[in-house]
């Protein structure tokens, strides 16, 4: 019986729905043989590898032509999965792609699990775990900078850094073993201790520098979580619609219209801004609105940036003052909306510079984008070309654990602990880093990671 890891799998690799092209993918030992049974055209057994071949998809049981197709034929090992791969390019549409997929399954292929093509690429050594995870980051990237960061990881920038560090740790452990087992001079113990101290500090500095990129990397991957807050009916939803340049939120003069949290993305200087339009934070007896208010408060706590909208045409209210107090953070921008009306707000009572806007007349909206750029990009140097950024929570957690192991080595050295005992923590650091690339990752973790991928990838 062919095991699950080595049978031939099939899946639709393009999004379901109408489109110009649909692709049904096969990977495995029998990919060419199975595809040949549903293809009328050139003999796939004799076509060159990495060739595109015109023909028709047919039902072998009836001879009925299903579609005019182009078949991409790629032979192992020079494929994404390092197996034989067939890609059947059909006209886009749910019916035709699904019919061809069902034919392939009837001819002996198995329906692929989510992420199974990439999993096979990993199991066959085509990519490591960080590169496999980067595949989904490329797919999910919302801006060009997020995409470039993911592509660098896919190309192996993070893998190379981790692998080089693991090799250096291994070399250090080997040298310690040699010095302990075969001492060639009297002060070998002192020299070995100094070697471990020097190398450990070097590894620690490298990993801590990498951790410092985590905040920026996470922003590139997930966006700047931006909560738009303010009391009801000050123009929050109108601001959201203006930034998005489309109508996403209901806008009325009725307080409490936004009853839930609305999330949308907008591209600011190549970095995704995750805009969260919150329900107006106020005391209310309406149960549905009250739930929205509670969610708004939670969004406020988790935000990287707060856009506080105040009504410039009215004096400050107690609610305004409360919002100013609870949103007092470094990355806050106070917006005075409705400046097209007579200004009555007490600007001298506001704690910082404000931006005067009129969402209705689209005035000074560009100043908001410039301020965000100043807060996150210019001051922090958010994106440096060719830099490696940590953006994956799993990677961040593991590197934090690796740094803790190195701290344990240094703490042991300070109290005079024998070097051979400190090898345990240094070895643990090496193993933890291996979990990042997949060299030391448990099977359960690998299965879980690939289950989060989309079907057909």
UniProtKB/Swiss-Prot annotation:
This protein's name: tRNA modification GTPase MnmE
Where do the annotations place (6S)-5-formyl-5,6,7,8-tetrahydrofolate binding?
25, 87, 126, 457
One GO biological process this protein is involved in is: tRNA wobble uridine modification
Native organism is: Streptococcus suis (strain 05ZYH33)
Chief place of localization: cytoplasm
Residues bound to GTP are: 233-238, 252-258, 277-280
Record flagged with keyword Nucleotide-binding: yes
Residue intervals of the TrmE-type G domain: 223-377
Q: Which PANTHER family match?
A: TRNA MODIFICATION GTPASE GTPBP3 (PTHR42714), TRNA MODIFICATION GTPASE GTPBP3, MITOCHONDRIAL (PTHR42714:SF2)
HAMAP family cross-referenced by the UniProt entry:
GTPase_MnmE (MF_00379)
Q: Where is this gene product found?
A: Cytoplasm
Name the UniProt key words of this record, in alphabetical order.
Cytoplasm, GTP-binding, Hydrolase, Magnesium, Metal-binding, Nucleotide-binding, Potassium, tRNA processing
GO MF assignments = GTP binding; GTPase activity; metal ion binding
Q: Which Pfam families match?
A: MMR_HSR1, MnmE_helical, TrmE_N
In the record, the note on similarity to other proteins reads: Belongs to the TRAFAC class TrmE-Era-EngA-EngB-Septin-like GTPase superfamily. TrmE GTPase family.
Q: How does it assemble?
A: Homodimer. Heterotetramer of two MnmE and two MnmG subunits.
Residues at which K(+) binds: 233, 252, 254, 257
What EC number(s) does its UniProt record assign? Answer: 3.6.-.-
Task: Report the cofactor remark.
Answer: Binds 1 potassium ion per subunit.
Q: Does the keyword Nucleotide-binding apply?
A: yes
What does this protein do, in the record's words? Exhibits a very high intrinsic GTPase hydrolysis rate. Involved in the addition of a carboxymethylaminomethyl (cmnm) group at the wobble position (U34) of certain tRNAs, forming tRNA-cmnm(5)s(2)U34.
Essential cofactor(s) = K(+)
* Top EC category: hydrolase
């Amino acid at each position: 019986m062919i095991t699950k890891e080595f049978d031939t799998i099939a899946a639709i690799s393009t999004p379901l729905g109408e489109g110009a092209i649909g692709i049904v993918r096969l990977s495995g030992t029998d990919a060419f043989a199975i595809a040949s049974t549903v293809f009328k055209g050139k003999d796939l057994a004799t076509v060159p590898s990495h060739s595109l071949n015109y023909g028709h998809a047919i039902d072998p049981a009836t001879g009925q032509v299903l579609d005019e197709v182009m078949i991409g034929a790629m032979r192992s090992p020079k494929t994404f999965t390092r197996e034989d791969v067939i890609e059947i390019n059909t006209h886009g549409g749910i019916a035709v792609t699904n019919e061809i997929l069902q034919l392939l399954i009837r001819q002996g292929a198995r329906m692929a699990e989510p992420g199974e093509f990439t999993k096979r690429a990993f199991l066959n050594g085509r990519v490591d775990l960080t590169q496999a995870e980067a595949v989904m980051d490329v797919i999910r990237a919302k801006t060009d900078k997020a995409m470039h960061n993911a592509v660098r990881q896919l190309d192996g920038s993070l893998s190379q850094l981790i692998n080089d560090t693991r090799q250096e740790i291994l070399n250090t452990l080997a040298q310690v073993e040699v010095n302990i087992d075969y001492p060639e001079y009297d002060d070998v113990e002192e020299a070995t201790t100094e070697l471990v101290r020097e190398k450990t500090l070097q590894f620690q500095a490298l990993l801590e520098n990498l951790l410092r990129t985590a905040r920026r990397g996470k922003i590139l991957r997930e966006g700047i979580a931006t909560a738009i807050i303010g009391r009801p009916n000050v123009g929050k939803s109108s601001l959201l619609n203006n930034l998005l340049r489309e109508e996403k939120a209901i806008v009325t003069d009725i307080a409490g219209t936004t009853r839930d949290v609305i999330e949308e993305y907008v591209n600011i200087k190549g970095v995704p801004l995750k805009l969260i339009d919150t329900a107006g934070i106020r005391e209310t007896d309406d149960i549905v609105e009250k739930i929205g208010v509670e969610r708004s408060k939670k969004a406020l706590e988790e935000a990287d940036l707060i856009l506080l909208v105040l009504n410039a045409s009215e004096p400050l209210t107690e609610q305004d003052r409360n919002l100013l107090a609870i949103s007092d953070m470094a990355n806050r921008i106070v917006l005075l909306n409705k400046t097209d009306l007579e200004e009555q707000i007490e600007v001298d009572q506001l704690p910082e510079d404000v931006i005067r806007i009129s969402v209705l007349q689209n005035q000074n909206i560009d100043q908001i984008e410039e301020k965000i750029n100043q807060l996150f990009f210019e001051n922090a140097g958010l994106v440096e070309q060719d830099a490696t950024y940590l953006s994956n929570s799993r990677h961040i957690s593991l590197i934090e654990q690796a740094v803790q192991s190195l701290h344990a080595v240094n703490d042991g050295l300070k109290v005079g602990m024998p070097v051979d005992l400190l090898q345990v923590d240094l070895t643990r650091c090496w193993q933890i880093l291996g979990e990042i690339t997949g060299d030391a990752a448990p099977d359960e973790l690998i299965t879980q990671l690939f289950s989060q991928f989309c079907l057909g990838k």
